[in-house]
């Protein structure tokens, strides 16, 4: 499969859309830098075009659909994972593995010196994400990108061969 994950793109869109509100459950200023205006507008149009699916009475706008139907799962899971990550860091975690990382921006928003992040996803996702991060001038110095098939069964060896230290406390996220 050589296509980008539509689920990852939609999750990124949800986080970008959520940033426009005054009160945010999840603050993610980096997400906006990774999604193009064209992608944002195209996804918005697709959601509006399918509004009748969510609200058959035809009485819905983009914000209503997003806030009542689409955003709660993505925003809630992401917020829970980030709160858990912050707790793990307080408890001494020095490594952070993001399985099926997609366009997750948490490794770039953690403020913890000496924490190494490992983003693991399919090669085309890793390539696209690293290009988006580079274009947005996001510092990736604490992140190791690993292209891998998560169904391979050889993940432990792949991670270790990319600098993972099995003796350090590690937090693992699997939102993808």
Residue spans for each PLM region:
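Rossmann-like AdoMet
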Residues: 1-97, 103-146, 166
